[in-house]
Swiss-Prot record:
In the presence of PdxS, forms a dodecamer of heterodimers. Only shows activity in the heterodimer. The active site is at C75, H165, E167. One of its GO terms (biological process) is pyridoxine metabolic process. HAMAP family: PdxT. PROSITE patterns: PDXT_SNO_1, PDXT_SNO_2. This is Pyridoxal 5'-phosphate synthase subunit PdxT. Pathway: Cofactor biosynthesis; pyridoxal 5'-phosphate biosynthesis. The keyword Cytoplasm does not apply. GO terms for cellular component: cytosol; glutaminase complex.
Amino acid sequence: MKIGVLALQGAVREHIHHIELSGHEGVAIKRIEQLEEIDGLILPGGESTTLRRLMNLYGFKEALQQSTLPMFGTCAGLIVMAKQISGEDGYLDKLDITVQRNSFGRQVDSFESELDVKGIAEDIEGVFIRAPHIEATHGDVDVLSTVGDKIVAVQEGRYLGVSFHPELTDDYRVTQYFIEAIVKPTLTEKV
């Protein structure tokens, strides 16, 4: 399978490395035309306001709103996938959740935590950098993991979102889950 990583900002190379470790082809997505060539898309972290501006500038907002590609958002990628961002409207409206930006604090408050992520593993290393958390889920959203009482990982159908940065660790199981459990089944739907 060919998995794209939106290459406007964030740890693009690290995400591609995790895709390759999962046994698949990773490609940096810089133009909307490339979306036709991939089976799934990862929206990496970074700064969510900057990410939205760049997505507007290069035409990705409309293309991704209309797309049915499976998507996996990490940190800022989770924020842009949300239907609601606390205090403002959502952006891509893919995950029926309300997200609170920077809810774990500033850069100096960044931390790592071992996570029990439902359906993946009980020992996933989560790297949280100015991370958001999910305040509320709606509809058919499945909560996959929490830190204390804060939701940090969810899935809704073909969309996966996490507050942390799995790509900044050596553990590629979250990316592998996205590809094998979310992207792969959608390919059989196309046949």
